[in-house]
Amino acid sequence: MITASEPLFYIHLSFYTAPRMCYTSFQGCDEMNIDEQKTRFLGICRETIHREGLEELLDWLLKADFFTAPASTRYHGAYAGGLCEHSLDVYDYARKLAFLSPTALSEESLAIAALFHDVCKVNFYTTEYRNKKIDGVWQEIPFYTVDERYHFGGHGSKSVYQIQYFMKLTPEEAAAINCHMGFSDGNMGTVRDVSDAYEQYPLAWIVHVADEAATFLLER
């Protein structure tokens, strides 16, 4: 358990030392970095999460594009491997913020909510090409675009649905994933609804802040 009495706790060293090599648009992480991210992601899941259905969920992610997909088309993590990288960044930030919770947090629940909050983006992006003149020569330049094949209506709610196809979530985990975008998610109902979720489930607020920090401070 992660408790409020722990002012600092172990955070994976890669939170501080992992190289940021992927910021040029569509440049992508090199294959070694993507493999390292995959190894770390799977390792955390198998060491921390002990729940029926985990291996089926991981098998789906391995067969899909989770480990090579971008986190967005043009903003944070808009490069190959960006989605997995972002998920790990949110996990690291959430662990760093967990001491703020007034009640002890389950390390398993924190890992589930942070690492899987964006699985709605699996098989969500595709690559297209546009012409761009570079040094006087027209070239085809690849770029990411959205190819939504399953319209669910909500970002976080889609992740909750997809996870629970394989593995059950607690109400706290479901709320944390569903509300991770905070008040910017137009499908979340009223501002009061989100505030109530954060008040009832500290993990939901922590994952939201971790997601914002990873997006706007680390991955720009």
Predicted regions and their residues:
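Histidine-centered, transition-metal-coordinating active-site segments
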Residues: 26-51, 93, 98-99, 203-220
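Non-catalytic interface/linker regions that flank or bridge core catalytic/transmembrane domains
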Residues: 11, 15-69
